[in-house]
Amino acid sequence: MSTIITHRQFPHYHKYTMDLAGRPLTLEVGKLAELANAAVMVTYGETSVLCCVTAAPRPRDGIDFFPLSVDFEEKLYAVGRIPGSFNRREGRPGEKGILTSRVIDRPIRPLFPHDFRNDVSVMCTVMSVDHDCSPEICGLIGTSAALAISDIPWNGPVGALKVGLVDGKLVFNPTSEQRKVSDLDVTVVSTGKKVVMIEAGANQVPNDVMFEAIRMAHEENQKQIALIGQMVAEIGKPKFDYPHADFDQELFQKIVDATMDQAKAAMDTDDKNVREARWNQLIEKWHELFLEDYPEMDKYLEEITYKFQKKIVKAWLLEGHRVDGRQKNEIRPLAAEVGVLPRVHGSGLFTRGQTQVLSVATLDTLSANQKLDTIWEETEKRYMHHYNFPGYSVGEAKPARSPGRREIGHGALAERALLPVIPPVEEFPYAIRVVSEVVSSNGSTSQGSICGSTLALMDAGVPISAPVAGISCGLIQDDDGSFTTFIDIQGVEDFHGEMDFKVAGTKKGITAIQMDLKNDGLTMEIIKNALDITYDARCQILDQIMLPCIAEPRPEVSKYAPKMITLHIDPDKIREVIGKGGSVIQKIVAESGAKIDIDDDGTIHIASPDAESCAIAKKCIDDIVFVPEVGQLYYGRVVRLMTFGAFVELAPGKDGLVHISKLADKRIEKVEDACKVGDMMWVKVTEIDEKGRVNLSHKDAMKEIRAKEAAGEIIK
């Protein structure tokens, strides 16, 4: 019986192309993943990312949030590699994959209807990687296109672009080589009118340059938005209707009318615990007043609380009043301390209001660098920052868990903020890890981690080029478009505000930005205002608190940190230092107790808890790679006597011959008349013949030494 093969056609296949920063961008629909609500294959240069969006047909019961999940899958076949895991499969998402998922999540989430409760899944699978074309940008564009043409309710589309700063010029979607020398890496996502996401790392870039990069990217994004708009017009599906989240507006209004004064009194405090206690008492009052008439009121309590608090906070902020009595540009009380923990390499405690972060710095050898097995170009990290957020920091009783996406994201933000000021490995050959423990949280813990990290690094003696501080800016907008920005947002302002605009940097410029929104985007006026007030605030933090605490990095690393010596040898000598099967280097490590790392270029890093062990290891290596130089003086031991001269050891296993005629100023009959085995003597290298044999002269050495001593030189 023969098999009949039918050639499959793709009747719904569509292809859209445009030029993006000098490279072709292609969006293909209707060929892959036809059963998803929508799927778009994005190809930019030779980078290909499949973006699929699906939605549950019915809302999830019993929730008061939008259940959106975004996954960015890194497939190592995309870069022609097999995973290094035991089963040779990709495992859980790596840090970069999680961070990219968050970058995609942040701009699309605010554009869904606020009362939409259907599960929505966004999955971006990286299938091919051209390092000149960012998979992150492909994921953002593909997700925007897929959601826009799907039947899922969404108020997009958005466009996305990266901007670099190369030789003082702004560059769209910089290539791999340009990124290596770029002073800026900012991702900007925008709708047709506003900017909805900014994520930046920068080498102390001034505000005006950062603003111009954002403005130019927003304008360039309109080309992508126009292309996706064309797709929607030609192949877009009608958006499906959904049941709107249930809410009792009548009950809400009665509660507001009856208890507005008590609610304002409950909110008006700078103590988070007091505010929550007062609010719990207020909820009890609601039960007394309304439970009999509204027996199902408990299922609305969370949303009633949210809407009521937001109503108060918004009205106050628009009037220039904050819940803790501060002015809109006023920072909470600050405190800074270093040397908090006795035996760690460096520690810093940073306090801002009821937010408190303890950061601890640890130094180790370069073998402790984090190895990365990803699709990205970076293969290892020398500077690492980890952020921990235990339940007790917000007064919750919950068990410890492994870091979630939020912890990883906040840790990466603080890491990115400090990276531009970390000294190069040539100047400071240590692996560096900072752990920030959030011990109390009332907003802006990520920015507290940045300040704490700076304190810990300086306390550890890491010669950072400039101290870094971080601060967040909030936003409230009125219905007429007027807005108020306010600095150093605390928890309740973050929860009920429309923006968390985090900016970190030095006095010279910005090192990191992360922007979270709960509205439909920011105008250029708001962005410029946020950049300006965060600059003033971080300078205030540096001048008034951090620098008075520790003005500059300690001159030396902690006595508990490993001592480090760096050598540079001829790469051809590496084999001799390592030895057959590692025998030589293992012997050096055993004898000295030091750790030794050898780079392919001949750079050797020696580390040990004490300087003596480093010195022993260094001498062993110096002896192995020692090459005598003609004309140089050496102080060596006589190891063998022959009738024609004496052999003097210049370094272990390396000796030279002092002919009998070169042993003394006068003629001697026997070598034994001038020296014996074990004697130490000065010798001068007079010749190294073509076979590598070294000829020495004690007579010439002493003549040169006497001349130097007569001239007042000290011979060592």
Task: Give, region by region, the residue ranges found by the protein language model.
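Single-stranded RNA-binding regions, centering on S1/OB-family and related RNA-binding modules
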Residues: Y560-M564, P571-K716
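Mobile "lid/hinge" segments at catalytic clefts and subdomain interfaces of large enzymes
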Residues: D151-M267, L457-P555
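Glycine-rich, flexible beta-strand/loop modules in the N-terminal catalytic cores of phosphate-handling
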Residues: P24, A36-S121, V126-S128, C133, ...
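Flexible, glycine/charged-enriched surface loops at secondary-structure junctions
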Residues: H114-V120, N155-P157, Q224-Y242, N273-V274, ...
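Conserved phosphate/anionic-ligand binding catalytic regions in large, soluble enzymes, centered on
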Residues: A38-M41, C133-D151, V338-A361, N442-V462, ...
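Conserved helix-loop functional segments at active or binding sites
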Residues: R106-H114, I149, V340, T365-A368, ...
